[in-house]
């Protein structure tokens, strides 16, 4: 959808899950993963017509499978900064890269530093495309992860944090001169698998960036003036001709190579937040002056701001959201905020919030969705169950036995019960199915009648009037043995699900005859 208008384009329409969507640098290609056919695969969606500028207004979108396979799982794609390569996670543990022109694949990590089979881990390309920062587990210290650095060509991972506690969510900031991450090393730790309090921290790639960042506001301003004067003396001052660079020239500009100095890097780690808290995501402004972060001090998440030179922190926007994530555009002009019930854009200059609206219709094949979810549960247990023998259960045979009930289920309450009984065959804790209906959806009225399903004639033969239901009153003519033939004048046929005639009829006058 557009960030400025409610124009929205549907990219996929399948019962299977799609996840990990990302834009190419030119914004004309989307990469994502889908579990169609029972296996996570990478897909590319491209704007077909050159004259169409963006996805929300595109009329034709072409989709292709990248590296098709029925056995190898590929997920969580990310385009390289130049758009020529795509990184992804293979079989839930290995970081890989594919050249989009040649389709040649190379291995960056071998999977030995990740143990969870949940699906993937945090990673990010460096701005120059030569490095990855990633979340990994060193010294077999699962599940406590560190932040690592590895060449985009593959090789040994350098542990940047070496902490006994969990560090996560690494991202490149300050033009690639530092990595921002969150850690529980100072806060309440998850000794019992919950309750972590986190801080935002920086690890600097080189001494020069570290020294500049630690300058006071006054010293930093003096440093900028000095550098400006030095450029003027050296004759490097930008003249009018250079200011008139064309858009094409700017487009071809390559990012500077990042200077990585591993020696002494453990001494270039700084804690940014003044106190540990229940944090969401964090972002540093393009100029490196401000830290924005989500934190839940009073029940839910709000947006906080910290001046990194003055060391001043304040509540910027009261969001009151149950979960929160944010991302800055590549120009550093806008911050996009996602919450549990809203999307918003914040202008980085004025720090004003603007809601992002969308207009979209969604059609769902609910039976196909339930079949996909059933298959997803089957595969999750098959790949992730802690006991290779599946507690002695023939999982394929058990799956076939429960699959036969799927065609007879027409609601998610019953589907949740099916999943609970199906998973219960494994005799293990923390499994089962739940369904929480959305109260904002269409409401189907209930007549408070039970029917004789052996009735073969027209309409529905009433077997019982439910006590205290709509027809259980003194003047009601409806009783057991009555045949209900029409609802609001529409005839009930033998092959019809009559409940659709009651859609959105709750608390409304309805004629039953």
Describe the role of every protein-language-model region:
Residues 4-10, 59-66, 258-276:
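A short helix->beta-strand "capping" segment at the edge of beta-propeller domains
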Residues 426-468, 472:
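PDZ/PDZ-like peptide-tail recognition elements
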Residues 473-496, 501, 512:
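Conserved PDZ fold ligand-binding element
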Residues 1, 12-18, 28-55, 67-74, ...:
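A flexible loop/linker signature enriched in serine peptidases of the S9 family
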Residues 8-12, 63-68, 106-113, 156-161, ...:
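A short beta-strand motif characteristic of beta-propeller blades
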Residues 190, 349-352, 356-421, 425-426, ...:
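Terminal targeting/pro-maturation regions of precursor/exported proteins
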Residues 2-6, 47-48, 100-103, 151-155, ...:
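Short loop/turn segments that connect beta-strands within beta-propeller blades
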Residues 20-29, 76-85, 123-132, 170-178, ...:
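Blade-terminus and WD-like Trp-Asp/Gly-His loop motifs, strongest in beta-propeller folds
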């Amino acid at each position: 959808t557009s960030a400025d208008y409610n124009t929205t384009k549907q990219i996929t329409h399948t019962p299977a899950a799609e996840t990990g969507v990302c834009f190419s640098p030119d914004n004309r290609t989307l990469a994502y993963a889908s579990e169609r056919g029972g296996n996570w695969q990478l897909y590319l969606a491209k704007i077909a017509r050159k004259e169409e500028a963006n996805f929300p207004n595109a009329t034709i979108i072409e989709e292709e499978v990248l590296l098709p396979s029925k056995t190898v799982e590929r997920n969580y794609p990310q385009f390289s900064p130049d758009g020529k390569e795509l990184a992804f996670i293979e079989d839930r543990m290995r970081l890989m890269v594919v050249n989009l022109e040649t389709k040649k694949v190379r291995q960056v990590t071998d999977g030995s530093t990740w143990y969870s089979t949940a699906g993937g881990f945090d990673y990010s390309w460096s701005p120059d495309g030569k490095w990855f920062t990633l979340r990994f587990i060193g010294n077999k210290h699962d599940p406590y992860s560190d932040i690592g650095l590895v060449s985009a060509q593959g090789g040994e991972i350098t542990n940047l944090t070496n902490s006994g506690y969990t560090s996560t969510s690494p991202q490149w900031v300050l033009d690639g001169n530092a990595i921002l991450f969150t850690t529980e090393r100072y806060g309440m730790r998850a000794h019992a698998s919950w309750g972590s309090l986190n801080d935002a921290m920086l690890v600097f790639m080189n001494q020069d960036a570290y020294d500049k960042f630690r300058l006071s506001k006054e010293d930093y301003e003096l440093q900028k003036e000095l550098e400006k004067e030095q450029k003027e003396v050296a004759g490097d001052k930008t003249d009018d001709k250079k200011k008139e660079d064309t858009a094409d020239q700017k487009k071809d500009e390559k990012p500077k190579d990042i200077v990585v100095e591993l020696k002494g890097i453990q001494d270039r780690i700084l804690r940014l937040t003044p106190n540990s808290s229940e944090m969401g995501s964090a972002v540093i402004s393009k100029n490196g002056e401000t830290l924005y972060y989500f934190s839940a001090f009073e029940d839910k998440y709000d947006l906080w701001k910290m001046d990194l030179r003055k060391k001043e922190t304040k509540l910027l926007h009261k969001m009151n959201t149950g979960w929160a994530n944010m991302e800055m555009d590549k120009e550093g002009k806008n911050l996009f905020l996602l919450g549990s019930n809203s999307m918003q854009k914040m202008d980085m200059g004025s720090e004003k919030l603007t809601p992002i609206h969308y207009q979209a219709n969604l059609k769902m094949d609910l039976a196909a969705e339930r079949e996909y979810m059933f298959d997803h549960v089957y595969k999750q247990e098959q790949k992730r169950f802690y006991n290779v023998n599946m507690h002695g259960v023939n999982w394929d045979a058990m799956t076939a036995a429960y699959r036969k009930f799927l065609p007879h289920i027409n609601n998610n309450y019953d589907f949740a019960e099916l999943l609970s009984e199906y998973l219960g065959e494994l005799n293990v804790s923390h499994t089962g199915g739940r369904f929480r209906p959305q109260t904002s959806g269409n409401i189907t009225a209930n007549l408070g009648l039970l029917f004789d399903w052996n009735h073969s004639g027209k309409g529905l033969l009433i077997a019982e009037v439910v006590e205290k239901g709509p027809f259980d009153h003194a003047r009601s003519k409806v009783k057991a043995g009555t045949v209900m033939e029409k609802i609001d004048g529409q005839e009930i046929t033998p092959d019809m699900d009559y409940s659709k005639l009651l859609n959105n009829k709750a608390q409304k006058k309805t004629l039953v005859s």
